[in-house]
Amino acid sequence: MPLQHFINQEKSGGIVLGISIVIALVLANSPWSDSYFHFFEHKLGFVFNGDNYLYYSLHHWINDGLMSMFFFVVGLELKREFIGGELADVRNTILPIGAAVFGMIVPALIYFSLNAGGDTASGWGIPMATDIAFSLAILYVLGSRVPLSIKVFLTTLAIVDDLGAVLVIALFYTSEISFASIAVGVVFLLAMFIANKLGVKNVIFYGVLGIGGVWIAFLMSGIHATIAAVLAAFMIPADARISEPVYLARASKLINQFREAKPNDVSTLEHEQVEIIDRMMSDSRDAIPPLQRLEHSMHPLVSFVIMPIFALANAGISFEGISFDAVMANNVALGVMLGLLIGKPVGIVLSTVLLTRLKIAKASDSMTMRRLVGVGFLASIGFTMSMFISTLAFVDETFLIQAKLGIFAASILGGVLGYILLRLSLIHISAPTR
């Protein structure tokens, strides 16, 4: 099923992402640490008539460029889920949506209560995020004994969490806005929307408008370019060039023609058969909506290339000269750690109990309290999105390092605690629960 395929891809990506984080930490604390940090500060851009355009550091290009592809896939997933997935029927998703919302609010409140009024207050958005790749990777390690309802709950929660993180970035981590550039970006978005309504299915067309128009305009506007990627993703057509009944009729006809075109038993195909296969391949491609075609083709790139590169560029922390007193000089690390490790589980558990007690939503029979708390701890793994938001929240390198330390501590502890609780709760289950 689509959800199971999504989970399988995410858990594999989580493993690769974990390896990349370890490599980044090793490099940052090795004899090559200076080379490691300086490498990502190299400037890249375009020069025209002696002037530099889009001239940013490699680190900036990774966070605003490559990560836009990650957010584009997030946008595709969100649109698919709203149309026909876990978020299509709100009645079936009240529980994980409520858990996601409370799981974002409580961590933010915990952080803000410890950092209100100071220079570090802007980091309140850091502990709000869940890393879907890592959380699902741990569910994968637990094996097939994990009830599907728990996988659906955590996946839906993480999807809503992603949407919340995107909104937080757009509304609270954007400054120095150029409304002229935004207007240009909106014009290109409108062009993509109109093309969608007119039935244009060519993904190259949308790619040119999305990158050459929307993304560059938003990059120059002051709004984080990753938001442009999400908006552009929502403009991608979700209906196929040919409908399912038409595809089935054509495929059946072509299969019959294929059978009739071979007069003997030789291993090679007749020329007519090759042409029939070409037509079937073309029809099969046209039967897949552009949205799903892009999502399917980009997922491996994002999971196994873009996310590991992001981790290599952002996860490296040098522990040289870092003391406990220095880390605790302010409440950044503590706020992030407590927000993720305490706020996430508390928000998720309290909202679930509240919604079920009020009979607003119904929890699955397989969702025991121990498993719910375990899922809450898995949701406290914030690696990717939390690190990304931390780079937007803090310019001061000291605050940034402290935030990353809090993220690492909470994510590791949350992952271990979540694994142990779920493992103990599943100890008597020997076969998959569907």
Predicted regions and their residues:
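C-terminal ends of transmembrane helices
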Residues: 2-4, 75-88, 136-147, 190-201, ...
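Transmembrane alpha-helix boundary signature
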Residues: 27-39, 53-56, 73-88, 107-125
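Entry/N-cap segments of selected transmembrane alpha helices
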Residues: 81-108, 178-187, 321-343, 407-411
